[in-house]
């Protein structure tokens, strides 16, 4: 397999245009190389425990890739398999992601694509927000998406969970000010 951008050695075969697990030959770190069309440069090297870190953005021929933290985990959609999540666990996940969103907002960055597809759960159960899908949006969009995430996790709206979601959203808003 050909080295990408003279730095990343693919560790597995992947279809053209798909993400590929690779080894950074400079650091010996395992990363995910994700093909991208655009990414906000401010996301590079933004470190937070609930954000998937983008270490580098590289060009290889006509293709552009984000070299991202390799996360041993899967998206919430895959984990849930169409079944709702326990209410307490749903609130914990939303609180973790709200904390990450607060970090983004404190830097003037808005994600705009917070869904069960862009939130990953690690093998240890930690929620991480994928930054590759971030779009240029507004604070209110992110906060609304946190509420929808809570609803999607539980399968329906419950007043007690709406309160937990509101608390997480409020915490995110306060932390970003």
Give the ranges of each region predicted by the language model.
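AlphaC helix of the eukaryotic protein kinase fold
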Residues: 35-45
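Flexible N-lobe loop architecture of eukaryotic-like protein kinase catalytic domains
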Residues: 47-50
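Activation-segment/catalytic-loop signature of the eukaryotic protein kinase fold
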Residues: 57
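Conserved short submotifs of the Hanks-type protein kinase catalytic core
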Residues: 61-75
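AlphaC helix of the protein kinase catalytic domain
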Residues: 76-85
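Activation segment signature within eukaryotic-like protein kinase domains
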Residues: 93-94
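Protein kinase catalytic-loop region centered on the HRD/HxD motif
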Residues: 99-109
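C-lobe/activation-segment region of protein kinase-like
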Residues: 128-167
């Amino acid at each position: 397999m050909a080295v990408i951008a003279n730095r990343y050695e693919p560790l597995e075969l992947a279809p053209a245009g798909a993400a590929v697990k690779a080894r950074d030959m400079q650091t010996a770190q395992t990363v995910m190389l994700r093909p991208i069309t655009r990414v906000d440069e401010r996301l590079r090297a933004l470190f937070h425990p609930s954000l998937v870190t983008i270490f580098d953005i590289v060009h290889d021929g006509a293709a552009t890739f984000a070299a991202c933290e390799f996360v041993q985990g899967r998206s919430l959609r895959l984990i849930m398999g169409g079944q709702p999540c326990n209410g307490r666990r749903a609130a914990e996940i939303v609180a973790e992601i709200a904390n990450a969103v607060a970090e983004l907002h404190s830097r003037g960055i808005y994600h705009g694509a917070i869904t069960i597809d862009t939130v990953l759960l690690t093998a240890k159960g930690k929620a991480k927000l994928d930054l590759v899908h971030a779009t240029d949006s507004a604070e209110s969009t992110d906060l609304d998406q946190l509420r929808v995430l809570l609803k999607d996790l539980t399968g329906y709206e419950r007043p007690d969970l709406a309160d937990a979601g509101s608390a997480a959203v409020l915490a995110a808003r306060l932390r970003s000010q």
